[in-house]
Regions:
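N-terminal secretory signal peptides that target proteins for export/translocation
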Residues: 1-16
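Short, contiguous, well-ordered secondary-structure segments
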Residues: 3, 31-34
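Bacterial N-terminal signal peptides
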Residues: 20-31
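N-terminal small/polar-rich segments of proteins
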Residues: 35-151, 175-219
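Short beta-strand segments and strand-loop junctions that repeat across beta-rich extracellular domains
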Residues: 157-159, 198-199
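Acidic/polar, low-complexity extended loops/arms that serve as protein-protein interfaces
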Residues: 158-173
Length: 219
């Protein structure tokens, strides 16, 4: 099994916009006091998967013959909730320290950081058959000392510049492993996720942190 934990444009919808690597997105962060998606085509080749969450590395672009590089950087998504708004039920939009805006497929500007986090990957097999599974695993809670916030308070919307289809769907963390989508061999799928904190619980002041891990596996 290949297992990755971690980050001419031809799409089913429009033209010119397909080893083992790891990426982790660290969700941190409560100091309490257009977007569109792409499914692109890649050629068959040796069995491999590539996954990028936030900042990633590639030797050039896929279209220019580039190949994936490992990038161990962990990006942080955060929000500071004003004391007057804590537990109000008004969702708080989160931002990221990721600066990744372009796709390594062809340097197309897919995402708009810091509001959006790039998430994308590809699956390749010699015969172009088989399917990879993209999933995300979260702990039950974010913590600040002995105080906690359910990780399910964090959700995301999905979109990307140039295509309105959420090919990596919107959702919320579930305190376990959540399957996001299947990726067929020969496809590069990418999206931009915008995260939000539901803010429905009154909690003590503090910085609440936790980490989620995105995984792309191919049997």
């Amino acid at each position: 099994m290949l297992h990755a934990t971690r980050p001419s444009r031809t799409n089913y919808r429009r033209p010119y916009r397909a080893a083992r690597l790891a990426a982790v997105l660290a969700m941190a962060a409560f100091s309490v006091a257009s977007a569109h998606a792409w499914v692109l085509t890649i050629t068959a080749g040796p069995k491999a998967v590539f996954l990028q969450v936030g900042i990633g590395s590639y030797s050039g672009t896929y279209q220019s013959g580039g190949t994936p590089l490992n990038n161990a950087q962990v990006n942080v998504v955060s929000v500071t909730v004003p004391a007057s708004a804590v537990g109000s039920g008004t969702a708080q939009t989160m931002t990221s320290d990721s600066t990744q805006s372009v796709s390594f497929y062809d340097n197309f500007v897919v995402c708009n950081p810091p509001a959006q986090v790039y998430i994308g990957g590809w699956v390749r097999t010699p015969a172009g058959t088989g399917t990879g599974v993209l999933s995300v695993t979260s702990p039950a809670t974010l913590t600040s000392g002995t105080t906690t916030i359910p990780f399910s308070q964090i959700s995301w919307t999905s979109t990307a510049n140039g295509n309105t289809t959420p090919d990596i769907p919107a959702g919320s963390f579930n305190g376990g492993t959540l399957t996001l989508r299947n990726i067929a061999a020969g496809n590069w799928v990418e999206n931009c996720h915008t995260f939000a904190y539901a803010n429905t619980t009154v909690v003590a002041a503090g910085t609440y942190t936790g980490r989620v891990t995105y995984t792309l596996s191919l049997p």
